[in-house]
């Protein structure tokens, strides 16, 4: 009988110690489990329809035009072209697509493959923020629909002098063009 009592006490002590160790141990990621219980924010690709259309910057030494299809098949397809001195000096194929519960902006500068993914992290009726903290530059791409009907695209890096934010002010391309 004494042996059974000692065995029960030992087993109970072991369970208590294991429980305390799991609470106190930094290798156990309790915060992750709690975090994973939070509902994931879900975005709908249709909520990005305001990006669709034909956009251009004001004429100057260089001009950029950007074109986005309407939302269809879980994606928007885009392209951007920069013209300076009468020549195309840069172009980029773009895609915004739903992948499961997430939405990604995929950039293919100069048709480079594979593209670079930027995950949608914030979406309102007038602004979309796409991020890829592991990318060199940009780390963040922001599209904003302005009250006057224009579109602002902003690229941001880590905030250093080398990676200053850049804003691109687009207006709708007139039908006469």
Language model regions located:
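Central antiparallel beta-sheet cores of small beta-barrel/beta-sandwich binding domains
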Residues: 42, 57-134
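Well-ordered alpha/beta subsegment
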Residues: 130-132, 136-145, 153-156
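Bacterial N-terminal signal peptides that target proteins for export
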Residues: 2-16
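Signal peptide processing junction and immediate N-terminal pro/mature segment
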Residues: 23-35
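Edge beta-strand at a domain terminus
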Residues: 37, 115, 119-120, 125, ...
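Hydrophobic h-region of N-terminal signal peptides that target proteins for export
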Residues: 16-23
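Short, low-complexity N-terminal intrinsically disordered segments enriched in polar/charged residues
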Residues: 36-49
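Mature N-terminal segment immediately following signal peptide/propeptide cleavage
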Residues: 47-58
């Amino acid at each position: 009988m004494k042996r059974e009592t000692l065995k029960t006490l030992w087993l109970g002590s072991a369970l208590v110690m294991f429980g305390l160790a799991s609470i106190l141990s930094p290798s156990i990621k309790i915060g992750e489990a709690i975090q994973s219980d939070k509902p994931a924010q879900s975005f709908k690709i249709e909520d990005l329809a305001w990006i669709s259309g034909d956009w251009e910057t004001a004429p100057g030494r260089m001009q950029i035009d950007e074109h986005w299809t309407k939302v269809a098949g879980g994606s928007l397809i885009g392209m951007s072209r920069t013209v300076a001195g009468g020549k195309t000096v840069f172009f980029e194929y773009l895609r915004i697509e739903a992948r499961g519960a997430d939405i990604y902006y995929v950039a293919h500068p100069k048709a480079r493959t594979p593209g670079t993914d930027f995950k949608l992290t914030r979406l309102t009726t007038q602004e979309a923020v796409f991020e890829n903290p592991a990318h060199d530059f940009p780390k963040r791409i922001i599209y904003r629909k302005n009250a006057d009907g224009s579109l602002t695209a902003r690229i941001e890096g880590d905030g250093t002098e080398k990676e200053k934010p850049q804003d691109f002010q687009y207006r709708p391309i007139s039908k006469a063009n």
